[in-house]
């Protein structure tokens, strides 16, 4: 399937995209390329392939629900512009 300039203008108008006439041919080429990829996907034989509806069958690793400090406090505070002890120091924003 190949799009002509009139169809590209119509698609742009429906999508409320303003395009210049100078950009029309570039956009036409991009859209034709996308449609070409879709045509390639339509040629794939998917007989006997069950659709994937989610990852519900995947087993998740479980860990204990324990509160930690992340074991990286010093590394995190090293990125702070100013720190006071184990805390970030920020300018006062409320008077």
From Swiss-Prot:
Catalysed reaction equations from the record: L-glutamyl-tRNA(Gln) + L-glutamine + ATP + H2O = L-glutaminyl-tRNA(Gln) + L-glutamate + ADP + phosphate + H(+); L-aspartyl-tRNA(Asn) + L-glutamine + ATP + H2O = L-asparaginyl-tRNA(Asn) + L-glutamate + ADP + phosphate + 2 H(+)
Class of the enzyme per the UniProt entry, highest EC level: ligase
InterPro entries reported for this sequence: Asp/Glu-ADT_sf_sub_c, GatC
Alphabetic keyword roster: ATP-binding, Ligase, Nucleotide-binding, Protein biosynthesis
Gene Ontology molecular function: asparaginyl-tRNA synthase (glutamine-hydrolyzing) activity; ATP binding; glutaminyl-tRNA synthase (glutamine-hydrolyzing) activity
The organism's place on the tree of life at top rank: Bacteria
GO biological process, one term: regulation of translational fidelity
Documented EC number(s): 6.3.5.-
Family as reported in the entry's similarity comment: Belongs to the GatC family.
Subunit structure: Heterotrimer of A, B and C subunits.
Function, as annotated: Allows the formation of correctly charged Asn-tRNA(Asn) or Gln-tRNA(Gln) through the transamidation of misacylated Asp-tRNA(Asn) or Glu-tRNA(Gln) in organisms which lack either or both of asparaginyl-tRNA or glutaminyl-tRNA synthetases. The reaction takes place in the presence of glutamine and ATP through an activated phospho-Asp-tRNA(Asn) or phospho-Glu-tRNA(Gln).
HAMAP family: GatC (MF_00122)
Stated name of the protein: Aspartyl/glutamyl-tRNA(Asn/Gln) amidotransferase subunit C
Organism encoding this protein: Gluconacetobacter diazotrophicus (strain ATCC 49037 / DSM 5601 / CCUG 37298 / CIP 103539 / LMG 7603 / PAl5)
Lineage of origin: Bacteria, Pseudomonadati, Pseudomonadota, Alphaproteobacteria, Acetobacterales
């Amino acid at each position: 399937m190949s799009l002509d300039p009139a169809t590209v203008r119509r698609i742009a108008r429906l999508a409320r995209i303003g395009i210049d006439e100078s950009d029309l041919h570039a956009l036409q080429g991009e859209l034709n390329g996308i449609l070409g990829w879709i045509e390639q996907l339509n040629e794939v034989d998917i007989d006997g392939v069950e659709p994937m509806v989610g990852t519900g069958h995947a087993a998740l690793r479980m860990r204990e629900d324990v509160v930690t400090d992340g074991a990286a406090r010093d590394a995190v505070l090293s990125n702070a512009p100013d720190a006071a002890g184990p805390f970030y120091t920020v300018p006062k924003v409320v008077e």
